Amino acid sequence: MEKVVRRTNTPAGKKVSFSTAFPPDMPDLTADPVHVANVLSNLIENAIKYSGEEVNIDIVVLWNQQGVELTVSDNGFGIAPDERRKVFEKFYRSSHLPDKQIPGIGLGLSYVRQIVEAHHGSVSLRSELGEGTRITINLPTAAL
């Protein structure tokens, strides 16, 4: 997971800072590492894309006997209450974006949900307009 953070490209005009907390004794994931890396990469890219010029991203990983919890939080534009469930649907794009020119076709979070659920996990979202978004992924031990 740390490799995904290090490989993140910062777009021109953005200042991105990361805060990460990975448990030192966390075992390697036995879930599909490519898919797990793609999920994290997608969440990071969304945090950057849907934030202003100064982006703060917090990534926290917790591990216990039940599995792994991965949380990605940002200080971005946030998601309106009526759109929080819709953002996980294919091709859905928020109508509350301050910049309608943000690229994308609305597949990222549907992909995240699909991969997480294929690993028998869950994904949840907390967000307020203007206050950022927190997405939490839970993967059970059986999927690891």
What are these model-derived regions, one by one?
Residues 84, 103, 108, 112:
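Short alpha-helical Gxxx[C/S/T] motif in the catalytic ATP-binding
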Residues 17-27:
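Conserved catalytic submotifs in the C-terminal HATPase_c
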